[in-house]
Amino acid sequence: MPKQEKMMLVLLILPLPYCNAAGVTTVQWGGHGDGLDRYLQRGVRDVHRPCQSVRPGRVWGKCCLTRLCSTMCCARADCTCVYHTWRGHGCSCVM
């Protein structure tokens, strides 16, 4: 598949909110500034979960249901975020 077709496919899929097996939930702000808060208050989600914008100035946010470590979510809430030389950030979980 040519690069341009892949980019168009990604752009078509991006606006859809999703939650994957790693516990990553991506949400789109409503442009009013409190859209993410309203999303987190629904159901059993905790408003105090760590969230960050994917890119500064963008309307997308990334929230972890466990622990946020750099740009990824750890497998469990009791994991710690550590920096590995040459590999970057990663989660360290006690068994």
Swiss-Prot record:
Share the domain note from the entry: Displays a mini-granulin fold, a structure composed of two short, stacked beta-hairpins connected by two parallel disulfide bonds. This newly described fold is derived from the same cysteine connectivity as knottins (ICK fold). The name 'mini-granulin fold' comes from the structural homology with the N-terminal region of the human granulin.
The protein's role, per its UniProt record: Alpha-D-conopeptides act as non-competitive inhibitors of nicotinic acetylcholine receptors (nAChR). Through its two C-terminal domains, this homodimeric protein would bind to two nAChR allosteric sites, located outside the nAChR C-loop of the principal binding face and at the adjacent binding interface in a clockwise direction.
**Complexes and interactors:** Homodimer. Pseudo-homodimer (identical sequence, different post-translational modifications).
Propeptide residue intervals:
22-45
Query: Can you say what this protein is called?
Result: Alpha-conotoxin GeXXA
The SS bond pairs are C64-C73, C69-C81, C74-C91, C79-C93
Identify its protein family: Belongs to the conotoxin D superfamily.
Extra information: Negative results: shows a very weak activity on alpha-4-beta-2 and alpha-4-beta-4 nAChR subtypes. The Val-47 is found by direct protein sequencing in the protein described in Xu et al., 2015, and in the translated sequence in Yao et al., 2019.
What GO CC terms are in its UniProt record? extracellular region; host cell postsynaptic membrane
Q: Output the lineage of the source organism.
A: Eukaryota, Metazoa, Spiralia, Lophotrochozoa, Mollusca
The free-text tissue note of the record is:
Expressed by the venom duct.
Q: Where in the cell is it found?
A: Secreted
Give one GO molecular function term: acetylcholine receptor inhibitor activity
Q: Which UniProt keywords apply?
A: Acetylcholine receptor inhibiting toxin, Disulfide bond, Neurotoxin, Postsynaptic neurotoxin, Secreted, Signal, Toxin
Q: Which residues form the signal peptide?
A: 1-21
Where's it mainly located? Answer: secreted
